[in-house]
Amino acid sequence: MSDEQDQGETKGRLSLRPVNRGELGRTVDAGSVRQSFSHGRSKVVQVEVRKKRGGAAGAETGRPSAPSRASGGAAAPRGLTAAEQAARQRAVVEQQREAARLEAERREQEKISILSAAEEARRKAEEEARAAEEAERLRAEEEARRREEEEAERRRAAEASQATAAPPAPAAAASPRAAMPAPTAAPARPGAAPARRTAPVPPATSASETLRLRAARTGRDEEEEASRPARRPGSGAAPSRKPSVPAPKKVGDDRRRGARIDVQAALSGDDERVRSLASVRRQRDRERRQAELERLRSDQVRVVREVVLPETITVQELANRMAARVPEVVKSLMKLGVMATATQTIDADTAELVVEEFGHRSKRVSESDVELGLEGQEDSETDLKVRPPVVTIMGHVDHGKTSLLDALRSTDVAAREAGGITQHIGAYQVTLESGAKMTFIDTPGHEAFTAMRARGASVTDIVILVVAADDGVMPQTVEAIRHAKAANVPIIVAINKIDRPDANPNRVRSELLQYDIAVEAMGGETQDVEVSALKRQGLDALQEAILLQAELLDLKANPNRSAEGAVIESSLDRGRGPVATVLVQKGTLRQGDIVVAGTEQGRVRAMLDDHGQPLKDAGPSTPVEILGLSGVPGAGEVFVVVENEGRAREIAEFRQRKLREHAAAAGAAARGTLDQMLARIQAGEQKEVALVIKADVQGSAEAIQATVQKLGNDEVRVRVLLAGVGQITESDVQLAKASDAIIVAFNVRANAQARTLASRDGVDIRYYSIIYQVSDDIETMVKGKLAPIEREKFLGYAEIRQVFNITKVGKVAGCYVTEGLVKRGAGVRLLREGVVIHQGELSQLKRFKDDVREVARGYECGLSFAGFSDLREGDVVECYETETVPA
C-alpha cells in the first residue's frame, strides 16, 4: 500500500529533474523552519542551504553507494573489486587535492583584493587631503586678497570724503544719518559659530560704498548659512531665535533688490533712481586703475642705465641696450628729423641724443675697444715654470739648414722639399737623450721668403745662424743677422759643411766681424760650433750650446692660463679644411677652446703634433696643428683663446672690416684719381699683368705676391687679383677670365671642373713647384708687355751754302755734306745758330739734277724739305734715322 502511495505521489509531483538523477552536482538543499514571534504567533519559512560544488561532489563521491534495488526482487548487490576501490580512492584524493588548491587560490585572491582596496583607499585619501589643502590655501589667499581690497576701498573712500567734506558743523547737519547710533546686533543663537568681526566703517562712507559693503556682508551670511549642517529630525527642538532688528529701509532699495517690479512702482516718483551695483563696481575699478597709473607716473623711479655706444649702431640694438621699445626709439628719432627703421644704422652722435632724451647715460667707445684685455694680465713670478727653448734655424739658401735640422731630428725632411730648398716654415719638437726638449723652427733661405724669416725671428728665443764653411757669408746670411738683431735674439753660429775639402771656418769668423758678430774664438761673446750635418759631426756640441744659452735666458712661462701664441704657417686642406700651425707661447691650449687668430676665429676641433699624432692639450713652447678655424689665418698672426664665441666673432669681424678698409685705401692710392686712371687707360701709357695666385700654404702665397710685385715698372704694373691657398676652383677661373689674368698654381692643382672651364674659356693656368721659376716667368711676361724702344741713329751734317727758288718746287737748299752722310727719307732737323727750328723729313735729294738715295761726306747736294721753306744760308741740316729695339 505504501508503494502504491509513493507511486501516486510521484505521478502527481511536477519536477524538472528526473527522479533518479544523481545528487553529485546539486549545490542547494531546501527545507522549511517555523519562526516564532511574540504573543504565541509563528510562521513557516522556506530555507535554502547552499553548499560548495567541490565539497558536495566530494562528499557524494566519498559516500558509499546504496545498494540498488532490483526491479524484480531484492537481489544482493555485487561487491567492488580491489582495483575499482583503489581507483575510487585515488579519484577521491585527487578531488580533495584540487579542492585544497582552489581554496588556496581563492584566499590568495581575497588577500590581493584586500591589499589593492587598501592601497586605493590610501591613495584616494592622500589625493583628497592634497585637494583639501590646495582648496584651503586658495581660500586663504582669496580671503586675504578680499580683505586687502576692502581695506583699500575704505581708505580711498575715507580720503575722498575728507577731501570733499565741508566744515564739521555743516557736514553733521547735512548727514544726520551718520550721527545716528548703530543698531544693536541681534544676540547669537546658542551653538552657532562666533560672528566674524568686521573693521569699523568710517563715518563718512558714501552711499555707494555702503551698498557695496552691505551686499558683501549679505553674501557672506548666505554662504555661512548654507555651510551650516542641516538639523536632523528627531534631534530635539531648535533653540528659539530672537527676532533681529530690521535694517532701515532705503529709498530705491526694494526695486533694485526685488525679484520683480510692477508698472505702478516703476512710474511712481516716490523713490529716486540710483546706479546699479555693476555700474558702481565698474566705476570703482576705473578709479582704482587711474589712481594706480597716476601713482606709477608720479612715484616710479626710472632706472638710469649706462648705454655703451660704438661708432655705429642699429636702432634695434640701441633699443635693446636702453631696455626700451623700438617704436619709442623710432619716434624719438623722428623728432630729431631722422627717419630710420629698426634695422637701420645710425651714428654715435644721433644715438647719444636719443639716449639723453630717454634719461640714460651714454658711454662712447671706439670699435678697437673690442680688443681691450684680449691678451690678459701679466703672470706673477710664482706661477712661472721652466719651458723648452724655441730655436730658429736661419741662413742663406743651400747652406744646410734643413739638413742640420734633419740630423737633430734624425729624419729626412730635405729630400721631400722641391728643388732641395725649403719653401715652407716648419716647427718641430725634439726630445734629447737627457730628456730635455727643444722646439725648432726651420725658415726658408731664398730671398723671396723674407717675411717668413722675419716671423721666425720674432717668435724665437735663440737663432742658429748656419753658414757654409766653403761659401762664407752670403746676402741671406746678412739678412738673417739683421732680423735676429731687430728681434733682440741671441745668435749661435753653426759653421756647416766642415767636411768639405775647401772648408775654411776661420774665413767665416772673419767675415762675420764685418756685421758685428764676434765669436768666442775671436774674443767675442757669440758661441760658434763647427758641425757637419752630412757626417753628423758636432751635433752634441751644438745641443750643449743651445741648452747653455737657454739656461742663461731663464725661459719660463705660466701653463695654468688661457693660451696665447703665434701662427707659424697656415694652409687649406681639402679634407680637413683650414689648418694652422701654431706655437703656444703662454698658457695651455686645449681641444675645444675658442681662439681668435688674426681675422679668423673658431673652436679647436682637433690638435696634432709634428708627427701627426692627436693631442688633447699643448703647453708652452709646443708647436701644434689646429683644425676648426673659420678660414685660413695669416702667417705671423697672434692667436688668443677667448671666453665665448660671441666675442671671438666680434673681434674677427672688426679685424676683417679694418683689413678691407686698408686694402681699399691702398688700392685707391695706387690707382690715383679716377680721372688719372681713365686718362692712362685711354692713352695706353700703362699696361698691367693680372695674376691669380694659389699656393699650398699662406707663407708661399705671400712670398710669391711680394716677389712678382717687385717686377713691375712705370709702363707695366703687376696686379695680384687674389693670393690664396688651396686648389684652383671654378670661381678662380671665372675671376681670371673676367680680368684677363693668368693663374699661378704653386704646389696645387686645379679640380676637374676648373680644368674644363679653363680649357673652354682659354684661361692660362701655370703650375710651379720652385719659386724662382715663378719669378723668371712673370718677369718675361712683364717684358713682353713693354712697348718697343725707338732708338735714334745719327747719320751726318750738311751745311746750307746757297738757297734756290725753283718754280713749282719751292725753295731748294744747296748743301755741302760736312760729316757722315745724308740719306733720302731720313729724318732731319734744321739748326739755326744751334737752335732746332724745324724737324721733319727730306722730300728730295739730288746731285746735279739726278735723284740719289744718299750723299756722302765731301760732296754737294740739293735738299728739299717737306712743308717747310724758311731756309737761310749758314743753317745746318742734321740727318738721322729711327730704329726700333725690343724692350
UniProtKB/Swiss-Prot annotation:
Gene Ontology cellular-component terms listed: cytoplasm
UniProt-annotated binding residues for GTP: 395-402, 442-446, 496-499
Annotated stretches, region: G3: 442-445
Molecular function terms from GO: GTP binding; GTPase activity; guanosine tetraphosphate binding; translation initiation factor activity
Main location: cytoplasm
Record key words, sorted: Cytoplasm, GTP-binding, Initiation factor, Nucleotide-binding, Protein biosynthesis
Signal peptide (residue range): none
Stretch list, region G1: 395-402
Protein name (Swiss-Prot/TrEMBL): Translation initiation factor IF-2
